Curated annotation (Swiss-Prot):
Gene name of this polypeptide: RIR1
Subunit structure: The genome of human herpesvirus-6 does not code for a ribonucleotide reductase small subunit.
Organism: Human herpesvirus 6B (strain Z29) (HHV-6 variant B)
Top-level taxon of the source organism: Viruses
Localization per record: Virion; Host cytoplasm
Protein name (record): Ribonucleoside-diphosphate reductase large subunit-like protein
Organism ancestry: Viruses, Duplodnaviria, Heunggongvirae, Peploviricota, Herviviricetes
Name of a matching Pfam family: Ribonuc_red_lgC
Keyword vocabulary terms for this entry: Host cytoplasm, Late protein, Virion
Length: 804
């Protein structure tokens, strides 16, 4: 039967009509007829019919806005969430335009070599897309929030038609396969034909075993254009001080990075008089980008605690709105921590030139110079107790990082280079003044749980037994190896196509493989977060990932690639590996593998200088139904308030004259843990009354077995701080970039004790977020439980997040 032709809606502006009552509206779907819970429940089929008439993903975005606007009055939210996620595919061009047809119709947008690849393998590509799309729709397709995340961040229009998710993945797979085939060393390592390479990439992306950053998804394979990038972090390391200097750099690098959806980081304390003006410029640019492009961006501000302006910045941070996407990161030298707990100790703060001289010192000479300047120069003083109190007040507000300068210098693979000016909690290499960056990739370790193993595999090396499950390390190593090859392909692509951030990647070719889904693994196999077996499993994951990354990077050099420019200056040139700098490191892999690797590194070099990172990719995690990083609590549903309107009905349920209120001021978003609900479905109503905090349940209502199972779902406030740090500490010898964590505090615990504990443990970059129990649960009204809105596989407890 001939399929009905459908019109492409290109009227994406103020002139189009709302499809629910056919009146002029700024929104494609204003939802005025469905402003009541009962109406929404009864009219799910009507919504489906309307969605069938939508022409693009942008329309699905508008519909999603409208539905979310009334969610707090809806008792069937999970059903609507799942339904909207399924219908998202039908509103995309995937059903109306084959992705390959769309790509081939856009020679002015898609790179010629990508077009040629799609033409050459068109029939095969169609068969692969059909297979992977079936699996994707049944298992991995995002719900309403995940789908809208795509619509926020990737807004490519190919000749008036927005890309669908399958079209985006096709463009990426075709581009990456073409790069691998064109680069000799990558082709030599793969040793596979184009069909195998393309199919493997497609299945990895659709099933979300690993994820590239959104900036890469947006720009990979498109015709070269000015100020486009595939990197999601831009770090500005500067010795310039004037506002004019900043404006030049901002126009060339920082603002274009924001327009691409990249997070930017810079050290502002070295700007003295102009610092506030610069900060205001950056904040206004973030607002403009988020308003006009729907992309989510973030600013990280680095503050040197020996600079006299540090107090001003800490005071400023305390008055920033909670919703601002600004993270402060304190750069803390060793001498500060030496004085940290001394009674009546004082801290000296220096002015511009002296502070800058201290910033250039390595950690060995920093303390000597600091004491000398204390004796011989004018400076300000503050008691350590007062300074620490300011820091703790800022930490309680959340989104503050710490960089322990001494630990960075001690464990850096590049000696005498100040690596502390990192980006988004990665100590990326600022080897020169200017822009530095890193390619980050997200690895979802949930995919490596299996129910059976082959007799040919070796326990403790190829797999470990976890109660009724197996964690497959052989598969983990295989996937990570392909991730490193893909990362090098993307970096080569950026250099060849004049990516405007390419100068920040060429010397170190740094890549960061960020772990996510770890806690889902623990919950699935029945391990509490701080259980010794959980700590051991996490350490083994980090070990296998690091080994595979270095092994693959060396293999690239053995197949003809040049070592990165920083190799000769690094400790790798001495035949060292990162964990060689730590004492008494437990390794599971055979020693002969490490010995061979050291010899090969010394003889052939490494293609990349950094590999693994225990840090968060804050935007990409949502599309894989996983938490940002590895911590025993979930905090990962963020709705943009700029696009959300609340529909206020008048008299009748079907009143089409309903109007929008002002922009949404507060929206409660309960997030539920799917695994918890499935295991304790019959107790769901009771668990809702205690806010899903398993430590608050009445033990008389559960069997002993159920209580043991419930313990797996404890929230972060239920674990002693030392247990959490031991968990995070276990992976440190194999994480050569920053490790950012969330720390949970009951109100009886003092934040002052956390900093020295992290410092002495050996953390380089830490403290992504601090959550206090009173703040976390202050919006949770247990007398009036709210409906469940999102579905997520990771995390521990259900909670309510307040968007102001």
């Amino acid at each position: 039967m001939k399929r009905k032709e459908r019109r492409i809606n290109k009227d994406f502006g103020y002139n189009r009509k709302c499809v629910c009552h056919y009146e002029a509206s700024q929104k494609r779907f204003c939802y005025s007829q469905y402003s009541c819970a009962s109406v929404l429940y009864e009219r799910v089929r009507d919504i489906a019919k309307i969605m069938d008439r939508l022409d693009s993903g942008l329309d699905a975005w508008c519909l999603r806005d409208a539905i979310i606007s009334v969610l707090r009055a809806t008792h069937c939210v999970p059903r609507v969430d799942r339904m909207l996620g399924r219908w998202y595919l039908k509103t995309s061009i995937f059903y109306d335009f084959c992705p390959d047809d769309l790509i081939l119709s856009c020679p002015n947008v898609i790179m010629p070599n990508v077009l040629n690849f799609v033409k050459k393998y068109r029939d095969f590509i169609r068969s692969v897309l059909y297979k992977v799309s079936v699996s994707w729709k049944n298992q991995y397709m995002p719900g309403v929030l995940g789908a809208s995340r795509f619509l926020e961040e990737i807004s490519n229009s190919l000749n008036g038609v927005e890309e669908s998710i399958p079209c985006i993945y096709l463009r990426m797979c075709a581009t990456l396969t073409e790069i691998v085939l064109r680069n000799g060393y990558l082709r030599e390592i793969y040793q596979e034909n184009p069909y195998v390479i393309f199919e493997e990439l497609a299945f990895s992306l659709f099933t979300q075993k690993w994820v590239l950053p959104f900036s890469c998804m947006t720009n990979l394979g498109l015709v070269e254009k000015a100020n486009s990038t595939v990197f999601d972090v831009a770090i500005y390391n500067t010795c310039l001080y004037s506002l004019a200097d900043f404006i030049t750099v901002n126009g060339e690098h920082l603002f274009p990075a924001l327009l691409n959806g990249s997070n930017i980081s810079m050290n502002v304390t070295r700007y003295q008089q102009e610092a506030k003006n610069i900060f205001e410029i950056l904040l206004s640019q973030i607002q403009v980008v988020e308003r006009d492009t729907d992309k989510t961006v973030q600013l990280t501000v680095y503050v040197e605690v020996w600079h006299v302006s540090a107090l001003t910045w800490l005071d400023l941070y305390q008055v920033l709105p909670e919703t601002s996407r600004v993270t402060f990161c304190l750069i803390i030298p060793g001498i500060f921590m030496d004085r940290y707990e001394l009674k009546r100790a004082q801290w000296s703060l220096f002015h511009k030139n002296i502070a800058f001289e201290l910033g250039k010192c390595d950690e060995v000479t920093f303390s000597t110079k600091y004491l000398e300047f204390e004796r011989t120069t004018d400076h300000a003083k503050i008691t350590m107790a007062s300074f620490v109190e300011k820091i703790c007040r800022c930490l309680k507000r959340g989104r503050m990082g710490l960089i322990f300068r001494k630990n960075v210098y001690q464990y850096s693979m590049i000696p005498h280079v100040p690596l502390y000016c990192g980006g988004d909690f990665l100590d990326v290499l600022p080897v020169r003044d200017g822009i530095n960056t890193c390619l980050r990739m997200l690895l979802n370790v949930v995919h490596f749980l299996g129910d059976e193993v082959s007799d040919e595999l070796t326990e403790e090396i190829d797999f470990v037994r976890l109660q009724c499950k197996f964690f497959m390390f052989n598969e983990l190593r295989r996937v990570v190896r392909k991730m490193v090859l893909v990362a090098n392909a993307v970096i080569d692509y950026a250099v060849d196509n004049k990516d405007f951030l390419r100068e920040g990647i060429v010397d170190g070719r740094s890549l960061g493989i960020c772990i996510t889904g770890l806690h889902s693994v623990f919950m699935t196999v029945g391990l509490s977060y701080a259980h010794p077996d959980a700590c051991r499993l996490y350490r083994m994951m980090c070990e296998h990932i690091y080994y595979t990354c270095v092994r693959t990077s060396v293999d690239c050099c053995m197949k003809g690639a040049e070592p990165c420019n920083l190799f000769d200056r690094s400790k790798y040139a001495l035949g060292m590996l990162y964990f060689d700098q730590f004492d008494n490191v437990e390794c599971t892999l055979p020693e002969e593998l490490w010995t061979t690797l050291r010899k090969d590194v010394l003889m052939h070099g490494v293609r990349n200088i950094h590999f693994t990172a225990g840090t968060a990719m804050q935007k990409e995690f949502d599309i894989i139904n996983s938490s940002e990083s590895f911590w025993p609590m979930e905090d990962n549903k963020i709705l943009r308030r700029s696009n959300i309107k609340v529909v206020i009905g008048k008299d009748g349920l079907n009143d089409v004259t309903s109007v929008y209120s002002s922009e949404l001021k507060s929206l409660y978003i309960p997030v539920y843990n799917n695994l918890l609900l499935n295991r304790f479905n019959k107790h769901q109503q009771y668990l809702k009354t205690v806010g899903y905090r398993v430590l608050n349940v009445d033990t008389n209502l559960f069997t002993d077995k159920e209580l043991d199972d419930l313990a797996v779902f404890k929230d972060g406030f239920s674990y002693p701080l030392n247990d959490l740090i031991e968990m995070y500490k276990s992976g440190l010898p194999f994480l050569d970039q920053g490790q950012a964590n969330v720390f949970y505090f009951n109100d009886t615990v003092s934040l002052k004790h956390l900093l020295p504990l992290l410092y002495k443990t050996g953390f380089k970059v830490a403290m992504y977020k601090v959550l206090c129990s009173s703040e976390m649960y202050k919006h949770l009204d247990l007398s009036n439980p709210l409906p469940l809105i999102g579905k997520c596989s990771d995390g521990v407890v259900m909670h309510v997040k307040n968007i102001l």
